[in-house]
Amino acid sequence: MDENKKRALSAALSQIEKQFGKGSVMRMGDRVIEAVEVIPTGSLMLDIALGIGGLPKGRVVEIYGPESSGKTTLTLQAIAECQKNGGTAAFIDAEHALDPIYAAKLGVNVDDLLLSQPDTGEQALEIADMLVRSGSVDIVVVDSVAALTPKAEIEGEMGDQLPGLQARLMSQALRKLTGNIKRSNTLVVFINQLRMKIGVMMPGQSPEVTTGGNALKFYASVRLDIRRIGAIKKGDEIIGNQTKIKVVKNKLAPPFKQVVTEILYGEGISREGELIDMGVEAKLVDKAGAWYSYGDERIGQGKDNARTYLRDNSQVATRLEAELREKFQPAEAPREAGDDEDKE
């Protein structure tokens, strides 16, 4: 760059800093690139699949899937992990369906959990924005986008046609929220539902679509698709679900990784079940017939007994987890690639 251009650029940068404050514009080389702070999900498999060890702070995350697939369970486990590390969590319950007894079973400290049950979508998103701007909340969960009903719809008559109202509300809210989320380093998780597009018959095209328009797809740094794929039985009794979680979008690590984990009723994601499955895959746990062995020790006949053994012997489980983390530990998060999609 010639001297005249350098002087012109220097003058422009000085003017920008004077008008908008120091750090408004900076060279990438002058900026300290730090590893992204994360909140663990409560699932070791998913933390590794995300590539950064959990859900990224200072970002928007979308978790979507069919009904009863484990969306709220996953967010409550992330809240529990956040609280274990001394963080503050907020849950905006637009569906008015949070069960505090179930949340407590998953390890959530319900006495310290900030809960809001707003009347309208505008109120829910305004509360989320105020909590984010306070800079004192580590994770805010909005459950769910589908339940964020615009005020005009609530005040209108049943059957009124108000096309695109919720999509416009989400687009406007996310434009306002994203800057505040980055500045306050808060993780904001939106739970979303699936709907079916009528008339989609093209091969290769999915008829499924998430609610609330396209804005959330663009603004989210991570999108997780969670689905129930089978039942877990103990004898004839169903005790949980086999669940597949796919990382559909990831701006901080390679996407499209997927994991199959177990969600047990009244317990949440089975940590011990994951340790056994990952241990077998990593050849740290031997499986001979129905027997599972770790080191020189037999830990159980059948997965359910092995799971119980690890639950009762926490030192063994902790040692196995440490070995698995060492083997699968994700590398430090790379710099984020520029997202060239236009935000709408």
Curated annotation (Swiss-Prot):
It comes from the Bacteria. One of its GO terms (molecular function) is ATP-dependent DNA damage sensor activity. The keyword Transferase does not apply. GO terms for biological process: DNA recombination; DNA repair; SOS response. GO terms for cellular component: cytosol. CDD domains: RecA (cd00983). It is found in: Cytoplasm. Keywords: ATP-binding, Cytoplasm, DNA damage, DNA recombination, DNA repair, DNA-binding, Nucleotide-binding, SOS response. Residues 323-337 have a biased composition (Basic and acidic residues). Residues 323-344 are annotated as: Disordered. ATP binds at residues 65-72. Transmembrane segments: none annotated. The keyword Cytoplasm applies. InterPro entries: AAA+_ATPase, DNA_recomb/repair_RecA, DNA_recomb/repair_RecA_CS, P-loop_NTPase, RecA-like_C, RecA-like_N, RecA_ATP-bd, RecA_C_sf. Pfam families: RecA (PF00154), RecA_C (PF21096). Belongs to the RecA family. PANTHER family: MITOCHONDRIAL DNA REPAIR PROTEIN RECA HOMOLOG-RELATED, RECA. Can catalyze the hydrolysis of ATP in the presence of single-stranded DNA, the ATP-dependent uptake of single-stranded DNA by duplex DNA, and the ATP-dependent hybridization of homologous single-stranded DNAs. It interacts with LexA causing its activation and leading to its autocatalytic cleavage. This is Protein RecA. The gene is recA.
